[in-house]
Structure formats: structure tokens, C-alpha cells
Amino acid sequence: MKKILIIGAGAMGAAFSIPLIDNNHKVFITEPYSQRFIKNLSSKNKFHSGLKINLSKKLIFKKYGKELFLEKYDLIVIALSLSGINFVSRELKKYKVKSPVLVLTKGLKYDKKNKKITTISQTLLKNIPKLNVSVLKGPCLAKELVRKSQTSVI
């Protein structure tokens, strides 16, 4: 059983927790932008309004903060919007996180200063050069993951 932290409790982060729990991993989920959202998700029925499902009772909700990064995880999954990548990158660097990172975020970033398009993994590695980072790409929608539909990812 691996200990996995998902940062981002939106549709894809929450949906990604399902196969992880199905494979008997200990899964934690947090939301840096909305404590109210994570509080609602951690209620008795664990209803996710975006996915229209009750999440697993085995899913463990954590308040976002410094204490979160003091724990050791076998994997950290980033499921934030593109705008959250720089924020979480600074947090991972600040707390000297050594866990491998899996990015679910779609998109490319435009570096205005260098007038260059970069991938999300390049953005993370720019801030944390020795970070062990992988990226999961679709086509795979959160609702397909919830329904356990066959999809393809690379």
C-alpha cells in the first residue's frame, strides 16, 4: 500500500482517487484554494458536486498547509489548474519535498520573460531541478475515470 497525496480536489483530482483506492493505496486529498470545498467533501456522504458522486469513504481529506508537506508520501499528484502550477512549485520547493510528482494538469505555459512556451514539467523542473516529475496525458476525462470507462493515457 502506497501513501499518495492528491493536491487539487476538483473533478480530475477526485476522479483520480478512485483507481488509486481501488488498487488499495492510502489516498489523501487536499484543496489549496477552497477550504470550504474540502470541508464539504469531507462531510459524511463525501458528495462531489462536479462529478455528481459520493467519493470513497476510504479517501482521507487533509487541510492544506505546512503540516501537509511535513509528511512523507510515496507519490504526490498535482491536479490543479494551470495557474496553480507556479504556486504548488514554490510550496514543494519551500518544504523541500522529495517525493516523486505526477502531474495531471493539461496545457502549456507561456514564459513572457523569455518569450518561450514551456511544458508543465519544465516549469516545475525550473524551480526544483532535481524533482522526479512525470506527466499523465489523455484523452481521459474525469467523468470517464469515475465511470471506469476504458480510456487511453500516455
Regions found by a protein language model. Give the residues of each.
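NAD(P)+-binding Rossmann beta1-loop-alpha1 motif at the extreme N-terminus of oxidoreductases
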Residues: 1-54, 59-64, 70, 111
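Rossmann-like NAD(P)(H) cofactor-binding subdomain of soluble oxidoreductases
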Residues: 65-66, 70-150
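Core active-site phosphate/anionic-ligand binding loop and the adjoining beta-turn-alpha structural block
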Residues: 152-154
